[in-house]
Amino acid sequence: MDSSLTGITTTGTPHLGNYVGAIKPAIKLSKKFKSYLFLADYHSLIKVNDPIAVKESSMKIAATWLACGLDSKNSLFYRQSKVPQILELNWILSCMAPKGLLNRAHAYKAAVDLNKENKNDDDYGISHGLFSYPVLMSADILMFNPKYVPVGKDQKQHLEITRDIADKFNKTYKIFFQLPEPIIDESLDLLIGTDGRKTVSYTHLTLPTTSC
């Protein structure tokens, strides 16, 4: 049976971007495929250093997913930090990932460009976590070897990096990972906000569980 995988980073209150880009597609796919859904609490450490805030965000996002119709009987729903094998795989994949590939990651390039604009050293304030974020995302995905991964256009590059790393692993050792295919909803470019206006950036539009 084919499978899909979706995760949400636990950095705050769920917003409309989470709903249209992750929660809604994941629930839809769970009716067709074996689904892996997770709370990406390790990823949140790049932006949030408060463990209480991460825990509260995890609870809110989990509650929102359930309130929006997630059937845990048809899906494996888990917290990233509760699967230690992900970090083990993260190290293995980091040995497969060329630095040049990670240099081209959008988040890292944006941080470098901002430093240049502010006349700072290129890597000023940039953590290794931010730089290697795509490798951990690759480990998240390849740990469960799904066929499909719903992604927004801004995350498509990370899935391409995952495919590149998986392909290199397969060629170095043996064919072990299938190359995950993206599911991209082209309609997500614009969303009608709660104020009735079209918006491209909707991460500030929070989503109470009663809205689902």
Residue ranges: model-predicted function:
Residues 1-197:
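NTP-dependent nucleotidyl-transfer catalytic core
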Residues 203-209:
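Conserved small/polar residues in nucleotide/adenosyl-binding loops
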